[in-house]
């Protein structure tokens, strides 16, 4: 009788563990399909003390993110710099020119992640290389992630210093008219399975 009780207890624990593992697997979603129409990459900077806003309308991406294994996450984004939208077609044309983004020579800005660190409370640090105009810089980007079933939303913001990438050459390389700090804000929506 004692042996049967031990066996039943052992079997019960195995079944409980199996059901917990199955439940965990059922709720584990890997997010990999970015939804560009539900996503945005925007920026804000100061020009002569006045806040100016803009965004990029087109980008491509590759993403692999499992909330249960964030350290294995990978992400890369290629932003079409000529898709800049400042609300002024004249300003957009100037920003695409040689002193600024020089989109004929450097059509895209690229970010490639190198590591993802979970901080708790749906907060993460995403480290990687950001390349603009052929100049690569190591960056660490704080981000949050929130899931709603098979849809996940990544949000974050960071400061880009345009001087590090020669955005604004010649007379524009000084920061008295256009500030060096550019606040980049993103919202990336992705689906998974």
Per-region residue spans from a language model:
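Low-complexity, acidic/polar, glycine-enriched regions of mature
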Residues: 27-193
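Sec-dependent signal peptide recognition
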Residues: 8-17
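Short, Lys/Arg-enriched N-terminal segments with co-localized hydrophobic residues
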Residues: 1-6
């Amino acid at each position: 009788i004692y042996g049967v009780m031990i066996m039943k207890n052992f079997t019960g624990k195995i079944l409980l563990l199996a059901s917990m593992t199955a439940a965990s697997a059922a709720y584990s979603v890997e997010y990999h399909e970015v939804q560009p129409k539900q996503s945005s990459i925007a920026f804000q900077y100061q020009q002569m003390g006045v806040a100016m806003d803009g965004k990029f309308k087109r980008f491509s991406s590759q993403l692999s993110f499992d909330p249960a294994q964030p350290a294995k996450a990978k992400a890369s984004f290629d932003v079409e710099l000529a898709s800049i939208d400042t609300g002024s077609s004249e300003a957009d044309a100037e920003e695409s020119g040689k002193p600024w983004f020089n989109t004929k020579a450097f059509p895209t800005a690229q970010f490639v992640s190198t590591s993802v660190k979970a901080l708790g409370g749906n907060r993460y640090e995403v480290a990687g290389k950001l390349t603009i105009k052929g100049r690569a810089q190591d960056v660490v980007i704080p981000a949050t992630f929130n899931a709603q079933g098979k849809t996940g939303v990544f949000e974050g913001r960071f400061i880009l210093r345009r001087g590090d990438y020669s955005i604004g050459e010649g007379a524009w390389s000084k920061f008295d008219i256009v500030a060096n700090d550019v606040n980049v804000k993103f919202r990336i929506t992705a689906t998974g399975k």
